[in-house]
Amino acid sequence: PLYSSAASDVYKRQIDGRIGFIGGMNIADRYVRGTQWGTWRDTHFRIEGSGAAGLQASFLSDWSATTKTHISGPEYYPPVGHFTDDILQIAPSGPFGKWRALLQADSYAIARARQRIWIQTPYYLPSEVLNTALQEAALAGIDVHLMLPARSDSKVVDLATHSYLDDMMKAGVKISFYKPGFLHSKLLIIDDMLSVIGSANMDFRSFEHNFEINAFVYDREFASRMAAIFEDDLTHCHTVTPGEWFTRPRTRRVAESLMRVFSPLL
């Protein structure tokens, strides 16, 4: 079909069931050549050990659902070595069933934050629950920082995304726009302990309609490394002030409000 409401945006790769890759990267020329307006910035990780088995299980589950062919056996789940003591959860999510695993997990993590919530996402079209949770965290004095591309691959999505930022900024959320190109990274850092990396954007489609997969890593050293990546990207950003944001043209704000209506479909 030309369009499906149950799209698959799962960016995971498997090698012999022993090594897995997870993050936002597609297999595409744009990662080498960039875009007309700059580089394509993404975050992707290699996983070895039991975490790779989790990716393998998710892949085989998707394969079974797609082809109606069940694949199992020890050859698909080879013995894996022990590499670190990091606690890692592989969390797939899809449009079937009552619960939305990634939305619930992110909302729970945000509600438990005490120091910082740092987010990188190419699109910000959140559910009301998630949007409110981030604003409440900022109002409680938590360092909430949202990093977005200055320009994404969709002008309509940019307009809809910006319609959510007024209330975020009023609540004290810091908003930075990545300037060198398209920021496609999907990263969530909670305090100095939890990092979330994967395929899911902060938007309706990822949480409600798409097949997605994220890795939840519970480790201080790893969180520190992710924070360093965030801070390095921040040197290539423009952090917007309220004075700048609230003086943008009225016609622009009207267009943003109109596009917001279509957020669940974008």
Residue ranges of predicted features:
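Primarily the HKD phosphodiesterase
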Residues: 108-174
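Thr-Gly-centered strand-to-loop micro-motif
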Residues: 93, 119-121, 148, 178, ...
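Extended alpha-helical targeting/anchoring segments
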Residues: 99-102, 133, 172, 184
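Single conserved hydrophobic/aromatic residue that forms the stacking wall/gate
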Residues: 1-7, 11
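C-terminal structural cap/anchor segments
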Residues: 154-202
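A general structural motif
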Residues: 94-104, 125-129, 156-157, 178-181
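Signature of lipid phosphatidyltransferase scaffolds
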Residues: 9-90, 94, 190, 196-266
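Beta-sheet entry/capping signal
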Residues: 12, 18-20, 116, 143-145, ...
